[in-house]
Every structure is written in C-alpha cells, then in structure tokens.
Amino acid sequence: MPNLREIFVSNATNAWGDQAMKSFIDLNPDQVMDAVETLGVRCTGRMLQLNSMENRVYEIEIENGLPESMWPDPENSPAHPKLLVAKFYRPGRWSKEQIQDEHTFLHELKDNDLNVIAPLIYQSQTVWPNPTNDLFFSVFEKRAGRTPYDLPKEEWEKLGRLLARMHLIGETKPAKNRLTLNPATYGDSNINAILQSPYLTDKYREVWYQAAKNAMQYITPMFDGIKNIRVHGDLHFGNILYREMEGPLLLDFDDFLNGPAVQDIWLLTPGRDENAKQIRGWLLDGYEEMREFPYHELQLIEALRTLRYIHFTAWISKRFDDPSFKITFPHFGSDEYWSEQIGDLFEQTEILSTGSQHST
C-alpha cells in the first residue's frame, strides 16, 4: 500500500467520460424502447422504471409476446410472454467481455436446471450496444416472486443446496474477465480510489487512511491459499425471490466475480450472535448435501465484512456525480459519515486483531 504522501489527490473528473455518463443519466423512454425494438419486438409504450442504483432497469410491455426464437424455455414458457426487463449498464464499470462472462455463467446455471434468470438470446448475442448512444443493454424474462423472510430450517437447507450446486458449476472454470475478490482488488485498489476522491476531506484523510491501513495488515495474510471460484458476489436477501412451487430464485449477478465460496454464505447470515450461527449451520447442512464446504473460509467473514465497508465507500465516491446518488446518500462526505466509517474500521480491526471470527 503506498504512503499517503505518494497519493495524488485531485478533484476527480468523471473517469468514464462526460458524454457516456450524460447519455446514461439522460436515458429516456423513447431511447429505451427504440433499443429494445432492435431485437425484433414491438413495444406497446407501457414501461416502468425499476429500482436500481448501479444500472438503469425497466419493465417493458411488448406486443404479441416474444418471438419463439427468444423464448427462455421453449417447453415451459407461456405462449406469448409480454413483459421484458431491459437492463442498461452503467458506462465504464464493465466491458462487453466482462458482461458476457456474467451471462455465460447464468446460462451455464440455467442449462443445469438452477433457478436463475438468464439473459435472452437474440441472433446468438445476449448484450448489445444501444444504437443511439452505445450504452450496453440486455433483456431478461420478467419473473415475479416475494422476498423471503423468517425462513424455516428446511428452507435454509434448500437454499444451501442451491448455492452448493451453483458453486459446483462455478468451480469448473474461472471468469477470465471478471474481478477476483481479494485484498488487492477490494482493499488496496478501493483505498487508493477513496484517497483520490474529493469527498474525503483533509480533516479525516489521515485518520481514515491509517484506520484502513491497520485493518488491511490483518486482512491481507488471511487470503493466502484461499481457493477462488465463480460466485454470485452480492447474495443478500434482496437478490433472492421465492416463487410458489419453485423455491428460491437467484437474481442480479451484476457483482459476479471470482472469490471464496463463503462470500455467498456470509451476506445471508451476517450476524455474530448465536441465532445467526444456528441459521448459518442450517444453510451449510443443506450445502454439504451437494458439495463439501471449505469451513476454514468462515474465518474470512470479518475480513470480507471490512472489505465490503471499504468497497461500498469507494463505490459511492466513484458515482457521486450521478444525481441519484446525491439523493440516496445525502450524508456522504459529511463529518458524520467519515466519523462513522472510521469507527467501523477501528471496530473491525479490533475484531480481526483478537481473532474473534465466525464459526458454526
């Protein structure tokens, strides 16, 4: 990690180019429907923008349904599915090749009967440039369901079996164009980005940097010898739907990457108390029915939690020129915000230094 004096701090200009971001922020319904209609469908004009901070996502009604060549499941699809979900990707985050890695994984999962929503295929492609502004977009089948809460033991076990099946496929090969979750990518790189951000003020710069640096001294050696496989990467309950007779449906693989298997476990059971450990045990009981779980990775939970804190701050700082981020995170960059972040890092460093790690 570089010395603080070696890091050049500037008023960050948009790293993705003003024109690309302007096109993304100004994306309008006509542009969205025009892009979708290049795939051989016709929109009715009815469209609903869905909740997404990272991308622009829309539910779109189409006339006469999908052409049969695009049906996600020709044997089981409704005769004429009329609702699509179109995702327009934030410029600069993922290349077309990186998006394609995600789509390839989703189709591998779908082809092995895992309950996921894979992108629709048109003329052998799943990701296309918007003809009016070159933003990449994809389309998906619309699926409904409910967010799960208070799952009984048997449902935790069922979810564990699903995750194990996903990891069995994930370990067959790496995602060659995606990130690997490790101290360098989620720690050092994000720390440098935050230090170069104009939103980290001089008042807190040195103390925040020291707090992050101290935490990283414990985190970095913990990843030695850890096996990386393809994982969901952001698997909390907001990214799972339950459908009657089908069970859990995994959503939003936008943060898909190479990483330890435990990354897809701890966000579902993030607590430190005995109840969280019991639930994690149920999840892993089901997991073990399909794949051997690397229990030594449970020692990474607090390290992964700390890296997520750092990554989340960097994520906001890189996007704070987007008006939607200013609305959603109005206290970002304030004294209160940085005091809280520093306190969290101090707390995590204390936990890491005493070896107070998770176990089942």
Label for each model-derived stretch:
Residues 2-43:
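Juxta-kinase regulatory segment immediately upstream of eukaryotic protein kinase catalytic domains
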Residues 47-51:
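Protein kinase glycine-rich loop
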Residues 54-81, 85-86, 119, 216-265, ...:
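Active-site acidic catalytic loop and adjacent metal/ATP-binding pocket
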Residues 61-175:
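ATP-binding pocket architecture of kinase catalytic cores
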Residues 91, 136-150, 191-199, 312-328:
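A glycine-centered beta->alpha junction motif in the catalytic cores
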Residues 123, 149-206, 228, 329:
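A cross-family kinase active-site recognition segment
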Residues 261-292, 308-324:
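Active-site activation/catalytic loop segments of kinase-like enzymes and analogous catalytic loops
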Residues 314-360:
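ATP/Mg2+ or Mg2+-diphosphate-binding catalytic cores
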